[in-house]
Swiss-Prot record:
The modification Phosphoserine is found at S252. This is Y-box-binding protein 2. Its main location: cytoplasm. Residues 89-171 are annotated as: Required for cytoplasmic retention. Disruption phenotype: Male and female infertility. Postmeiotic germ cell mRNA levels are greatly reduced. Spermatogenesis arrests in late spermiogenesis. Early loss of oocytes followed by defects in ovulation in observed in females. One of its GO terms (biological process) is mRNA stabilization. The lineage of its organism: Eukaryota, Metazoa, Chordata, Craniata, Vertebrata. One of its GO terms (molecular function) is DNA binding. The modification Phosphothreonine is found at T67, T78. Residues 198-209 have a biased composition (Low complexity). Found in a mRNP complex with PABPC1 and YBX3. Found in a mRNP complex with ZAR1 and ZAR1L. It comes from Mus musculus.
Length: 360
């Protein structure tokens, strides 16, 4: 039987699929007619049939893409090891001492110079194992001696497990911020305190009138005011007056106290919802009594006039005008020496004319 006939038989006969093995290889069994010797070429043909099975449309579950490592493990029959993580990097040296060449706190990386090989090793802030407890950020100081492990990185040697000499915490950079000594206090709004409740008296001795009086007393109780700050107290500021001091001031302005009394009662009956308005009285000059009137009056030219009416006190003397000029006051003279002058004018003249009285 030639190779061509064997391939035709392989495609025509139903192929039995075998589940994949642990190595991911699929085996196909092809029936061979009895009485015919199996040749080496037939084995190859069987292999060819296995290869042509998927192409002919046989439903085979082909494994995923193979890697070079998987091909080697398929031949050996052992599972492939998982991919190596970043933490399992090969360690080149452990507990190596070095001096920090420079470290940037803002960017979080720098370089350490090894003391044994004088080689610069990259260090990141995440590689610092024991940081200064007083520092807020992880860092190492410039020129500081540190102890670290050297591992293989993507671009070269890299430091890991960075501590101080002997495993102590590192000092840190002087540019790294320090931690706050105390926790920041955040004030929280407190709920308003409920009004003080009046203690309930025993039910046996209560009276209906006493409860109403207690309710009025609780409503009239003044609220406590917080004192002003120290710098505000030193100023002489006139604050609002209590209601008991405003009552006499309002009565002095001409308002009767009878009208103000019911208003204050209404305000007290309310729950002090609206504070009393501030009232500042207008300044008024105090009353000064005027001096008594002079018995004589003066004319426009400063001369005296005798009284036209009787002086027995039955009729009051005329008052002097209010719009009198100021300079006339200086010409005013006492009435004592003027009486003989008036008598001389009223004396009879030696001439034969009858006596006359000078009147203006």
């Amino acid at each position: 039987m030639s190779e061509a006939e064997a391939s035709v038989v392989a495609t025509a006969a139903p192929a039995a699929t075998v589940p994949a093995t642990a190595a991911g290889v699929v085996a196909v069994v092809v029936p061979v007619p009895a009485g015919e010797p199996q040749k080496a070429g037939g084995g190859a043909g069987g292999g060819g049939g296995a290869a042509s099975g998927p192409a002919a449309g046989t439903p085979l579950h082909a494994p995923g893409p193979r890697t070079p490592g998987n091909q080697a493990t398929a031949a050996s029959g052992t599972p492939a090891p998982p991919a190596r993580s970043q933490a399992d990097k090969p360690v080149l040296a452990i507990q190596v001492l070095g001096t920090v060449k420079w470290f940037n706190v803002r960017n979080g990386y720098g370089f350490i110079n090894r003391n044994d090989t004088k080689e610069d090793v990259f260090v990141h802030q995440t590689a610092i194992k024991r940081n200064n407890p007083r520092k807020f950020l992880r860092s190492v100081g410039d020129g500081e001696t540190v102890e670290f492990d050297v591992v293989e990185g993507e671009k070269g040697a890299r430091a890991a497990n960075v501590t101080g000499p002997g495993g102590v915490p590192v000092k840190g950079s002087r540019y790294a911020p320090n931690r706050r000594r105390f926790r920041r206090f955040i004030p929280r709004p407190r709920p308003a305190a409920p009004p003080p409740m009046v203690a309930e008296a025993p039910s046996g001795g209560t009276e209906p009138g006493s409860e109403g009086e207690r309710a009025e007393d609780s409503g009239q109780r003044p609220r406590r005011r917080r004192p002003p700050p120290f710098f505000y107290r030193r100023r002489f500021v006139r604050g609002p007056r209590p209601p008991n001091q405003q009552q006499p001031i309002e009565g002095s302005d001409g308002v009767e106290p009878k009208e103000t009394a019911p208003l204050e009662g209404d305000q007290q009956q309310g729950d002090e919802r609206v504070p009393p308005p501030r009232f500042r009285p207008r300044y008024r000059r105090p009353f000064r009594p005027r001096p008594p009137q002079q018995p004589t009056t003066e004319g426009g030219d400063g001369e005296t006039k005798p009284s036209q009416g009787p002086t027995d006190g039955s009729r009051p003397e005329p008052q002097r005008p209010r719009n009198r000029p100021y300079f006339q006051r200086r010409r005013q003279q006492p009435p004592g020496p003027r009486q003989p002058i008036a008598a001389e004018t009223s004396a009879p003249i030696n001439s034969g004319d009858p006596p006359t009285t000078i009147l203006e």
